[in-house]
Amino acid sequence: SNDNAIAFTEFLYEFFIDNSIPMWLEIEELFRNGNWRKYVYMHFKHNQCLICKQYATEVHHVYKVARAGGRKHDKYYYERMPLCSKHHSEVESIGEVTFNKKYHLQGGIELTEEEYNSIKNKYKGHFKESEQNYKKDKEQENE
């Protein structure tokens, strides 16, 4: 069935990434088109730039934190994507719409709480404000 084919493609993609095995472009495209959200998260999980697969040193905020009032208002669930410094500079200079069209992207993803907790230590300094706000939100929930 179609669901089995999608599940198998996801399994293959994750297996190839986990084991640093080069993959056919067709497998990557199937996975990318079949589940964009998982595709982006896998790149976060493995510190890979969404564009070139090099080490992702940057976390691009699709929703600009400046619009939210600055980094002190940054939330872990804001939409973002993992990028290398070259591609992060590019998206900042040419803009989101042009960048997404150029690389056929569907945008960033909002991380779930579980995803955020699993990757926050891989991107040193990029989630500092998010972490502080996350802790404040949790404290307020418990009051």
Feature map (PLM): residue ranges:
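Short, charged/polar micro-motifs that form catalytic or ligand-binding hotspots
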Residues: 1-6, 35-42, 74
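Charged, alpha-helical interface segments at or near domain boundaries
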Residues: 1-25
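Short amphipathic alpha-helical segments
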Residues: 7-11, 78-86
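Hydrophobic/aromatic-lined pockets within catalytic cores
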Residues: 17-20, 53, 88, 92
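Short Cys/His-rich Zn2+-coordinating modules
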Residues: 27-39, 62-70
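Short cysteine-rich loop/turn motifs with clustered Cys
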Residues: 33-60, 86
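Histidine-centered nuclease catalytic patch
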Residues: 47-80, 94-97
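Polybasic, low-complexity binding patches
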Residues: 71-78, 89-143
